[in-house]
Amino acid sequence: MSLTEQLLRPLLASPAKPLITHYDDQLGSRVELSVATTLNWAAKTANWLVDEFDVEPGDEVAVQLPAHWQTAGILLGAWWCGARVVPASAGARVVFIGPDASVDAPAVAVVSLDPMGRGLSTPPPGGALDYLTEARMSGDQFTPLSPIPGDTPALESSTVDEILTEARARAEKLGLSAADRALSTLDWTIPDGVLDGFLVPLAASAHLVQITHADPAKLDRKREAERTTTDLG
């Protein structure tokens, strides 16, 4: 079973439960995603990766993005179809980059990072694709063509089973549970940032309050407003 299915299966009984709250202090934005909405974006991404790029289990997908709710959907979608998430573009079926970045690769998906989920205002150059505009047309449900084995690489060289075991162990060490609301300012570097800042709270079914471009002067107010119970960093 894929990493995404194993992480989200315990949450399916409460689809309306808030799962990710994303702040961008540079933009002054706040976006909240429920379990259902997160699952929806993951499914759209997985379908798009399979249909547009023929991604199969073990294929590399490069993700060069900040901690963001859109990045969450991309990561979960990639794992759902069995992709191996890597930071480097060489050998990747597709490279996901932000709107101000550029990369020399055969297949590039540009992610607008717009808080409200709008696509790019102008078409990306060089044959690159607008991820949000393209992927939102894909299906809201996804089923892998075949089960994803636990020894499939999922995050650089670590397998599905290894990542899940490590994320659960770190969550247990932190005392995280489904009742927690975890505030994080960690960047989602690959692999450590993604593991500590994204997978650990998911493994505990905790609510993640992720702050990008965090303003230190506003953190205490956010802790109070979001009723967070712990800090991840």
List each language-model region with its residue ranges.
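A short N-terminal helical cap/helix-turn-helix that marks the beginning
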Residues: 1-21
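A generic structural signal for well-ordered alpha-helical segments
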Residues: 11, 78-79, 201, 223
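Conserved AMP-binding/adenylation subdomain of ANL enzymes
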Residues: 168-179, 189-233
